[in-house]
Every structure is written in structure tokens, then in C-alpha cells.
Amino acid sequence: MFRSRVSGVFQQVRFQSTAASKAASKAQGLGAKVQGITNCAVYWAKVTGELGKQIYLKEGFAPPSLSQFQSVYQNLFNSVKSYALKPQKVIDCAESITKTDALRYTAYGVQILGLFTLGEVIGRRNVIGYKVPSADKH
């Protein structure tokens, strides 16, 4: 009887250690995979950054100058001001939109809404709504 109890205890210990070693080996394998993916992502991010620098220098890209900013915003301000002073221009523009233009602008709107929604889901880390603690705990 003593012998069966002792062997049962040793068998349980052996099974527990086997389960622990299996879990440890799986965790090590997962860690190696994550490290490999991370190293790959860092490498390609560096390559992309260096390529971007070379393109920036070769193409002669530069941020817009102050005069360019001023001209763009001045034109935008004048357009908004003219539409505010003459509302009939807005109606004429709306009437001149064709079916293909309406479809194109609708597609753009859906894309923008989709990207906004994706950003919201990423920010919340939840697809539907925010996680709110229940009122039962109060």
C-alpha cells in the first residue's frame, strides 16, 4: 500500500514536471519566433528609412516654404469667402456633379471612414465600444 502511494506521488510529480517542461519549451519556441519577427521588422524598417533618405536627397525634396504655405492658405481662404458671400455658387457646384464624380467621392468617403474606424478600433483595443467596468461592483 505504501509503495503504491509513493509511486503515485512520484508519477504525479513526473507528469507535472513533464507538463512544465513542455510549456517551457513552447514558450522558448514562441520567444524565438517573436525575436525573429522583431529582428526582421527592425531590419526592414532601417532599409526603408535609408531608401527614403536616398530618394529624398536624389529628388531634391524639401518642406514647403513660408510663401508656399501663405499662398495655399490665402487661396483656400478666398475660396471659402467667395462661397460664403455667394451661396448660389455652392448650389451650382452641387448641380454640376456627375454620377461618376458622386461615385468617386462616395468611394473616397468610405475609405476615409474605414481608416478612421480602423484607427478607433486600434486605439480602443476593442472592436465594439470601450471596456467599462460593470455597475455591480459599486
Curated annotation (Swiss-Prot):
One of its GO terms (cellular component) is proton-transporting ATP synthase complex. One of its GO terms (biological process) is proton motive force-driven ATP synthesis. Keywords: ATP synthesis, CF(0), Hydrogen ion transport, Ion transport, Membrane, Mitochondrion, Mitochondrion inner membrane, Transport. GO terms for molecular function: proton-transporting ATP synthase activity, rotational mechanism. It comes from the Eukaryota. Signal peptide: none annotated. It is found in: Mitochondrion inner membrane. InterPro entries: ATP_synth_F0_gsu_mt (IPR006808). The keyword Mitochondrion applies. F-type ATP synthases have 2 components, the catalytic core F(1) and the membrane-embedded component F(0), linked together by a central stalk and a peripheral stalk. The central stalk, also called rotor shaft, is often seen as part of F(1). The peripheral stalk is seen as part of F(0). F(0) contains the membrane channel next to the rotor. F-type ATP synthases form dimers but each monomer functions independently in ATP generation. Mitochondrial membrane ATP synthase (F(1)F(0) ATP synthase or Complex V) produces ATP from ADP in the presence of a proton gradient across the membrane which is generated by electron transport complexes of the respiratory chain. F-type ATP synthases consist of two structural domains, F(1) - containing the extramembraneous catalytic core, and F(0) - containing the membrane proton channel, linked together by a central stalk and a peripheral stalk. Belongs to the ATPase g subunit family. This is ATP synthase subunit g, mitochondrial. It comes from Yarrowia lipolytica (strain CLIB 122 / E 150) (Yeast). The lineage of its organism: Eukaryota, Fungi, Dikarya, Ascomycota, Saccharomycotina.
